[in-house]
Structures are given as structure tokens and as C-alpha cells.
A protein has these predicted regions:
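N-terminal, polar/Ser/Thr-rich
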Residues: 20-110
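An acidic, Ser/Thr-enriched
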Residues: 145-222, 226, 230-353, 479, ...
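Von Willebrand factor
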Residues: 345-404, 409-453, 481-488
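Short beta-strand-loop
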Residues: 387-416, 439, 459-465, 489-493
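VWA/integrin I-like adhesion module and closely mimicked acidic/polar interface patches used
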Residues: 453-499, 504-506, 511-518, 585
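Intrinsic-disorder/low-complexity signal
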Residues: 874-1015
């Protein structure tokens, strides 16, 4: 049941991060696990997470004696295949530059660390390149700094020399944006520092600047823990320095806090400096530290373990305080309040959702199976009836109904799970829709849900509020946070909060046993949060309830003195209780203001369009990269001015608008519309209207038509793919190792997709391709690529959601709206298709898109003819008739014997449409009008197309239609270009025939056949 309550939403919070100490797996559990994971062994290294306490019922339970001694290795997960801080610079989809060295500086204050990393990459090619810098961050890390520049060193340099390294004096680990570049003045040439810019404007400015062959870069949020930065130019035969700065919270283990730095193994040289304020800090591997004032510094060169950990013994509730010179004072604290624990009644039936996507391969899947076995074994009396839904882009049930939770059934389940392939993207929304309303269930029932997934929804619905609505009327959802990189904690928190469930932290095997029963504890309703001496108090995650053992990140404004306390008001059975937790001694830290800014931005972003302006102001001021803003660097100040990127009144907005009060006020006004698809579409139109780079004008008649459309017209549910191939044994021989290494070859994946299309089904083919999206979330080129393939496979709902993600990130590219309209038309969603067809016709788009308007008008006219003459239900048929009459008169072409359109998926690419007529005359970019009346639209040499050929009266004979591939982005080494072609015969008549085709263009091959038409 949805449990959002305004009185609780006024505060914020972190859904239950509960951690428990394992008292020992049963022999049966171990035997079950042996069946499932014997072939899924991962690399090793500890990965601790959060607090564990002994003797607490439910979510607070377990744990040893806290800070008296460090936990052993069994308290943490092994080192994952997906290593935090790992990076690469891709030039195309197959080639990457070599990482020569990596220098890392870590500053730890209380529960938080600031990390600055210098990467040195070599372009050993003889030509300039554009690269995509991909960085995998630790869980919940928040980047705030990005810079890029060429060095004077040759690419052949292997070991960094002293001038290439950044000198670090005792205690001087510069991490403020104003200091980082200054400290590196001698280390690079003409470096560029990124600025915070609204995300849509950053994408537009970047694309425009690349076309001028100058030096931009953009850092974008691309999914959980994944940031993508396009860098240009990468000079030939030179080393290039990329600097990244981010903040991350330490992990609580027992009563201790731990920071863990994972180093990628591909770095040929690594230097690490760590500075800590806590005198009790211990470090592993052990090295001698040096004292510098109140801080202790540790230095490493080429550490063999590739993992460095810092343990703070029993720090209590660390309190960071700091000032922003333009705004005022801020504080941040991490607290685990003591709450009484008691058992709660629950459903005796449960559905487990187990993520089998590529991101689970292999490390997470092993964890999910261990958790699954423990929960089933230790809750046999309470969870009597179970079923399991395994999901990625597809979803399939273990059994066609609930089965008894018996040891024999659990053993069978785990044996079956061990046979599954781990591939594909993650369609979380489709899985939740199926889990809450199983196809095999005749009579709806209320059952609890256990989500064993990283929560990163890389496929299908991406609106978190819309996904949350799928839980309306369902039982509680419980999720588990492993601490592994790539976890979308915000999604897990949101879903558990909305369903009345909880998220439990499971740092390692030692915490599984208690976490397995944590859901049985009774939650406390959160009524209020105060901090003595503080104001504008926010709690990360916006919980409606607290569980015993809860770890809360609390931030706010004000100057806190010694003796400050967190004061919670909680309620159970109508009885209120005040819980007071003393905070630690204040630690002066520059990290406190940004900790506040990060949580405040997350609050405001959650309310979407209603607080979009304030969210951007907060994100810009506190340098919070994510859903609202990107880091963008351009060549000069003039370039920033050219795109209207200038300092706004962000400081004033942040100072004058406390986030907590604004959040509470706007939430009360907008709660009913969050997740509503019609409201989301109207918000899209509002953003387009406010975008100065588009200059869109929305007619009143269109607004009226949108208002007439029912809410259902805007819903585009995407059912899980109905695949046939699910077993690991059914994978291509060479594919399984690639998936396990997360080292995907585009050619291998596309070959696998072609084989599956022939041998199994289109859905199986698309599942193979979706692994590219899972591995590269946020990559618009890949999303378009796979979207075109989905259209070609006849899977139009999947294509629509891929194109929608591209449009969200690149709203200034009009061809995407046309693609969305085409997909919707194929789905029979005619009202929404009409709405999207109109968008390219309402804006003033960049000239590089050629005669886009003419092509969309012809396409739209074809659609309107079908809508007005067909039987598809529409709420705006009168509007469609009026638009049909107006467009037909405007175009002045009632019919045509042959119409051909092409569009493609890569920017800065010159693809030309060539049509050879029966006479032998060829219509192409330099001969656009033929003697028989054939015409071609203007040549598009920079964008994504489209181009169109029209012949009204076609002489009899053969028409050869081809795409000529003259130029791709010269700065990329090997990205693919795909053409989506539509061929109309007898356009505008009852004999009209439509052929759609996707053609992959091969580098080095100029001419590619599309179709042959006989008249």
C-alpha cells in the first residue's frame, strides 16, 4: 500500500539501512548455495558496508562488539568485477586508449571522504580523436569536479616522472575546485575546467562546439554510479590528463567507519595519498603515517593489493560543520538512533524478484542467491508460500503459481537459478508490474515483495514516480543494499518507502542471517526531525518510517555547538515517543556545505518540474552533477556567452529559499501528479518552451487537443520481452566470457542478436542487444542504435522507451520525436503519436537538420490519413481532420508513386540517399532533380538526417535505392552508423505499401543497398 504522508514528507530520510551480524548459515543453506553458485565464482577483496548491532530483533540485529576489533574478511563482500574508480577512454565502441598512470588524493573528515583522481591517458594514434571517458564511481559517490588537458609528454611514456605527478606536501591535499587547477599549472597545457550547466543546455552546447572542431567536454549522469564524459580533442601521440573529484560517505561496520579505495588493475602506475583527521584511524596495507597539524597522512606507491582501506574506530555520530562564504553555515551528520524493536505481522505469501541482467553478472547474482536461500530458510514459519520472478528485459516465473517454502523446493529453486544466463538490460518497471499482478493469478492477492536487484532501471520506464505507482495496492517491498558499485540507492529507497517496506544494508556474508529476518521488525512512523541549534533540516531519502538500527544522513543550516543532538519524534500504535541522540564534537570541514547541497538537490529534483528552477540553482551552486545539471567545459569565455551560459542568481536562490520548507510546500501541491504520464508530457512541453535553443511555439489548438486526451492516452506500458532462450548453456560459445568480464564487443553482440533472431525470436535478439545498453547507460548513440533495431524487430514499445530516454537527454534533436511518433503509431497509440508528430513542426531547429519539417509533414500527413479513415479509437479525431486538411493544402501533393526517407543514429555523419531510376539517371545530393520528376531534399552532412526522395509519377522499371556512407565523425575510431529507411509505394492511395528497413553501414564501404522497387 502506498504510504506517503505529508506530515512525514516534510522531513527527509534514508530508508532503513540496516545491517546485522550473521550467527552462522545452516548446513541446508550451504548445500543449497553449492548447487547454485559453484560456477559463478568472483574475484576477491573485502567490500564492507554499514553498521551491524548485536541482540536487536529484526533490522537492527546482529553484530559483534563494534569498535573493539576490526571485523574479519567474512564481514565484507569479495572484490567485484565492476571495480569502483575504474575508467576508460573509448574511441568508438571497440577501441580504447591506454591508461598510463593514476594518482589519487583522499581527504577523510568524519563519515565523509573527498577524492581527487588524476588519470593519464595516451593517444598513441597518429590522428586527433574524440573520446568518451567512462568512470565507474563507488556507490552513492557524487562528482563535483572535472578537468581535461593535454600534457607535453609523449604517449610512449610508461612510468610517470616527477613533473607529471602532482607534488603533495604534508597535509596539503588540494581538493577545492579553486585549488585543484592551480596546483596543476605545470602539469598540463591549456587545461579546461568544467562548469555546472543545466543538463539540456550542456548537451546542446557540446554538440555545437564539437562541430566547430574545438575543445569541449561534458560530464553526464548516465545511471547508477556511472558518469560519462566526452573529451575532445585527444591530440595524436600525446598524454592527456583527466582530473575527477567526488565526495562519498564512509561505510559503517559495527561501530566503526571504513573507507575503501579500489584501484583498477590496468593502471601501470598508481600513487595514493590519504589524509585523515581522526587520530584513531588505521590503514591497510599498513604504512607509516606522518603527522601534519591535526591530520595524519599516509602515502602509497604502486600498492600491490589494489585495495586500500581506512578504518575509524567507534567514531559515534560524527558531526561536520562548515561555512559557505556566500550562503552561511551548514552541518552534516551520520546517526544511528536507538529505537525499540518488536516483531510485526506480515503476509505469509511472498514474491521474490531476482535480477538476472548483465549488471548482476556474476558478483551480485551470487549475493542474491545467498540472500534468497537465507530468507527462505530462516522464515519458513512466516513465509509459507513463495514464487520467484527472474527478470532483465524479460521476466519469467520459476513456477506457474505459489509453492510451499520447503527445503526441497528451495534446493530445486537454487539449482534452477544456477542455470540462468546473466545478460540484458534491466526493465524494473515491467518486472514490478508482473510481480504485483502475476499472469498466473486468477484472484488478486496482497503479497509482500522482495527485490534482489541493484535498482538501476536501464530499460523501459525511467520515471521513478511512475514505477512507484506500480506498487499501489501491493504489499510491502523490501530491498537490500550491498555497497557494490552501480547500485541505484535512490530507486531502492523510493520504492521501499512508497510501499511501506524497507531497505536493509548487507555488507557481507556475516550480515546475511540477521538481514534475512529484518523485514519482520515493526517500523516506527516518523513524525518529525529536529537538530538542536539547526534549521532547514533534511534527511536523505525521505522515509515515512524508521526501523531499529536505522542509519540516517541528516543535514541542515546553522552553526552547531558542542552538545548538539538529533531529536526524532516517532509513533507506533498512536503513541508518540521522542528519541534523542547526542552528536559528536563538531569537526570543521569543507565537506559539510556540499553534503547539505547534495541532499537538498535530491529533494528538489524529486519534485521534477515543480521545483526545476530551484533544483538547478542548488545543483549549480553546490556543484551536484546528476539529473539536473552536467559539468561542461568549452574553449573560451566567449563560447559560454554564445550559448547563454553565465552565472545566474543561484547564490541568492539558495540563500533565500531553504530547501526543507520549499519541499514541503510544493509536495503538498503536486503529490497527486507525480508519476502521472499526462503531467509528465505537459512538463516536457514546458521545458521545450523554456529552452532558448529551440524556440518552440505551441498553438492554442494543440493545447486544447492535449487537454482533451484522456490520461490513458499517455500511458505506454512495456511488457517484459517474451524470450525463449534463458539458460547459460544457450549462449553463444564466445559470448559468456565477454559477459562475465563485462568486456562486450559490438560486433559479437550484434552477431549473437542476428543468430537469435533466426533461431529463436525477435525478443531474444533484442535481449542480446540490450546488454550494450546495460553496459553503457546514458549512451545516446547506442540507445538510438538499439532503438532502430527494436523498430526493425517489430518491438515498438521497447523502441519508444529507448527513444524517450534519448529525448530526455537531447531535447534539441527533433528527429527523436519523429521516431517516437513512428513507434507509437505502430503500437496503435494514435493520440500520443499525434502529440509527438507535432513537436518537430512547432520548433525552430538547427539548420543542420536540413529539410526536417518537409519530411515530418509528409510522414505526419500519411499518419493522419490513416487515423481519420481507420478504426483506431481517438479522442482528437476532429483535430486530426483539421490538421489533415491544413497539411494537405500546405504540401500540395495528394499522391506519389514513390517516397523514400532515411534517418540515422550518429551525429556528425554524412549519409546520402541515392536513387537510381529505370532510365539510369541517379538522384543524389549533387543532382537533386531528375528528368522524370524525382526530387531530393537538401543534403544533411552533420546531423542525423533525415533525407527524402519523392517521385510523383514513376516510369515503369526498377528503382535501386542505396545509402552512400561518405563521412562519419572523424574524431571517433569505430562507432557504427545505422540507417532507418522507410519506402512508400503508391503514397496517399488505397494501394499504399510501406516497407521499413534498418541497414548497418560498414566503414570503408561506400554504397549500401536499401531496397529495390519494381514498378
Amino acid at each position: 500500500m502506498r504510504t506517503l504522508k505529508l506530515s512525514v514528507w516534510i522531513v527527509a530520510g534514508l530508508a532503513a539501512l540496516v545491517s546485522c551480524k550473521m550467527k552462522g548459515d545452516s548446513a541446508q543453506s550451504q548445500r543449497n548455495m553449492d548447487l547454485a553458485v559453484s560456477e559463478n565464482v568472483s574475484a576477491s577483496a573485502p567490500a564492507p558496508m554499514v553498521e551491524a548491532k548485536e541482540g536487536m530483533a529484526g533490522p537492527g540485529g546482529g553484530g559483534g562488539k563494534g569498535g573493539e576489533k576490526p571485523a574479519d574478511d567474512k564481514a565484507t563482500w569479495k572484490r567485484s568485477q565492476i571495480v569502483p574508480n575504474s575508467s576508460r577512454v573509448m574511441v568508438g565502441d571497440r577501441e580504447e586508449l591506454a591508461l598510463r598512470s593514476m594518482q589519487t588524493r583522499v581527504t577523510i573528515d568524519g563519515f565523509r571522504a573527498r577524492v581527487v583522481i588524476d588519470y593519464l591517458y595516451a593517444n598513441d594514434r597518429d590522428r586527433q580523436l574524440e573520446g568518451t571517458f567512462q568512470l565507474r564511481l563507488p556507490e552513492d559517490a557524487s562528482p563535483y569536479y572535472f578537468a581535461f588537458g593535454e600534457t607535453s609528454y609523449e604517449a610512449s611514456t610508461v612510468k610517470p616522472t616527477k613533473p607529471m605527478l602532482i607534488a603533495v606536501s604534508d597535509g596539503d591535499l588540494a581538493n577545492d575546485p579553486r585549488e585543484i587547477a592551480q596546483q596543476r599549472k605545470a602539469a598540463w597545457q591549456a587545461p579546461k575546467e568544467a562548469r555546472m550547466v543545466p543538463r539540456e543546455k550542456a548537451a546542446f552546447a557540446y554538440g555545437q562546439t564539437v562541430r566547430r572542431r574545438v575543445d569541449p567536454g561534458i560530464v553526464e549522469w548516465a545511471g547508477a554510479g556511472v558518469f560519462s564524459a566526452r573529451v575532445f580533442p585527444l591530440a595524436p601521440r600525446k598524454l592527456h590528463r583527466i582530473v575527477v573529484g567526488y565526495d562519498v560517505d564512509l561505510t559503517r561496520i559495527g561501530k566503526d567507519l571504513e573507507y575503501r579505495l579500489d584501484l583498477p588493475e590496468q593502471a601501470t602506475a598508481a600513487v595514493v595519498d590519504v589524509s585523515v583527521t581522526d587520530p584513531r584511524a588505521t590503514i591497510s596495507p599498513s604504512v607509516a603515517g606522518t603527522q601534519a597539524g591535526s591530520r595524519r597522512r599516509f602515502h602509497f606507491e604502486d600498492p600491490k593489493d589494489h585495495t586500500i582501506t581506512v578504518r575509524l574506530a567507534n567514531p559515534g555520530a560524527p558531526l561536520l560543520v562548515g561555512a559557505d562564504e556566500k550562503i552561511g553555515s551548514f552541518f552534516a551528520t551520520r546517526v544511528a538512533p536507538e529505537l525499540p524493536s518488536s516483531a510485526a505481522p506480515g503476509s505469509d505469501s511472498a514474491v521474490f524478484l531476482v535480477d538476472t541482467s548483465l549488471s548482476s553478472n556474476p558478483d551480485r547474482f551470487n549475493i542474491w542467491l545467498k540472500l534468497l536461500a537465507a530468507i527462505l530458510d530462516q522464515n519458513r514459519a512466516s513465509l509459507r508460500h513463495i514464487n520467484v520472478l527472474f527478470f532483465s528485459v524479460d521476466a519469467h516465473w520459476w513456477k506457474p503459481g505459489f509453492v510451499d517454502n520447503t527445503p526441497a523446493n528451495v534446493a530445486e529453486l537454487l539449482a534452477f537459478a544456477g542455470t540462468l544466463a546473466l545478460e540484458g538490460a534491466t526493465d524494473l518497471g515491467a518486472a514490478l508490474r508482473e510481480a504485483t499482478h502475476p499472469a498466473w493469478q486468477q484472484t488478486p492477492s496482497r503479497h509482500d515483495l522482495f527485490l534482489l536487484s541493484d535498482g538501476a532501471a536501464t530499460w523501459g520506464e525511467s520515471d521513478l514516480h511512475a514505477i512507484g505507482h506500480l506498487l499501489d495496492g501491493a504489499g510491502s517491498l523490501f530491498a537490500y543494499q550491498t555497497g557494490l558499485a552501480g547500485t541505484d540507492t535512490a530507486t531502492l529507497v523510493h520504492l521501499t518507502r512508497d510501499s511501506g517496506g524497507a531497505m536493509f544494508a548487507v555488507a557481507g556474508e556475516s550480515e546475511i542471517a540477521a538481514a534475512a529476518t529484518a523485514h519482520r521488525a515493526r517500523p516506527w512512523r516518523l513524525v518529525g526531525v529536529e537538530v538542536t541549534g539547526g534549521s532547514d533540516v533534511l534527511v536523505a531519502g525521505n522515509p515515512t518510517a524508521l526501523y531499529p538500527g536505522q542509519s540516517m544522513l541528516v543535514v541542515g543550516r546553522g552553526t552547531l555547538a558542542a552538545g548538539a543532538a538529533l531529536v526524532l519524534t516517532v509513533e507506533q500504535d498512536g503513541k508518540r515517543q521522542v528519541v534523542k541522540t547526542p552528536l559528536g564534537a563538531p569537526v570543521a570541514s569543507a565537506l559539510a556545505p556540499r553534503a547539505y547541497g547534495q541532499i537538498a538537490t535530491a529533494h528538489l529534483e524529486e519534485l521534477e518540474a515543480a521545483t526545476e528552477g530551484e533544483a538547478r540553482a542548488y545543483a549549480t551552486h553546490f556543484r551536484v552533477t546528476g539529473r539536473t545539471c552536467s559539468l561542461l567545459m568549452l574553449e573560451s569565455e566567449a563560447d559560454y556567452e554564445r550559448f547563454g551560459i553565465r552565472p545566474d542568481a543561484d547564490d541568492y536562490v539558495v540563500k533565500a529559499t531553504p530547501a526543507a520548507a520549499l519541499f514541503a510546500k510544493v509536495l503538498a501541491q503536486t503529490l497527486a501528479t507525480l508519476g502521472d504520464p499526462k503531467a509528465a508530457f505537459l512538463a516536457l512541453l514546458g521545458r521545450l518552451e523554456r529552452n532558448p535553443d529551440i524556440k518552440i511555439q505551441i498553438p492554442a489548438s494543440y493545447r486544447t487537443a492535449i487537454a482533451q486526451m484522456p490520461d490513458a492516452a499517455f500511458q505506454v506500458p512495456s511488457a517484459p520481452l517474451a524470450t525463449r532462450l534463458r539458460a547459460r548453456s544457450e549462449l553463444g560459445r564466445d559470448l559468456a566470457p565477454q559477459l562475465a568480464r563485462h568486456d562486450l564487443s559490438y560486433d559479437a553482440i550484434t552477431a549473437e542478436a542476428a543468430a537469435r533472431r533466426a533461431q529463436a525470436s525477435p525478443a531474444d535478439a533484442l535481449k542480446a542487444l540490450s546488454s550494450l545498453v546495460e553496459e553503457n547507460p546514458g549512451d545516446a548513440v547506442l540507445a538510438r542504435d538499439v532503438g532502430f533495431s527494436a523498430m526493425d524487430l517489430g518491438l515498438h514499445a521497447q523502441a519508444f522507451h529507448l527513444f524517450r530516454r534519448v529525448a530526455d537527454a537531447r531535447p534539441h534533436e527533433p528527429q527523436t520525436y519523429r521516431a517516437m511518433a513512428q513507434a507509437l503509431a505502430q503500437l496503435g497509440k494514435v493520440d500520443l503519436a499525434l502529440a509527438y508528430y507535432e513537436i518537430p513542426l512547432m520548433g525552430q531547429w538547427d539548420p543542420r537538420f536540413g529539410e526536417l519539417r518537409k519530411i515530418v509533414e509528409l510522414d505526419y500527413l500519411h499518419f493522419l490519413r490513416g487515423l481519420t479513415s481507420g478504426n483506431a479509437p481517438s479522442s482528437v479525431r476532429d483535430y486530426a481532420r483539421a490538421r489533415l486538411d491544413g497539411l494537405a493544402a500546405q504540401i500540395g501533393m495528394g499522391r506519389a508513386d514513390l517516397v523514400v526517407t532515411i534517418t540515422w543514429n550518429t551525429d556528425n555523419t554524412d549519409v546520402d540517399l541515392h536513387v537510381t531510376e529505370p532510365s539510369g539517371e541517379e538522384c543524389f545530393y549533387s543532382h537533386r532533380n531528375t528528368r522524370s520528376g524525382g526530387t531530393l531534399t537538401q543534403d544533411v552532412t552533420q546531423g542525423y538526417g533525415p533525407e527524402m526522395y519523392v517521385l510523383r509519377e514513376a516510369p515503369k522499371g526498377r528503382y535501386d535505392i542505396r545509402a552512400h556512407y561518405y563521412a562519419s565523425d572523424a574524431n571517433r575510431a569505430s562507432a557504427r552508423t545505422k540507417v532507418y529507411a522507410t519506402v512508400f509505394e503508391n503514397w496517399g492511395t488505397k494501394q499504399e505499401k510501406v516497407t521499413e528497413k534498418v541497414v548497418t553501414l560498414e566503414t570503408g564501404k561506400e554504397s549500401h543497398p536499401i531496397a529495390t522497387v519494381e514498378r
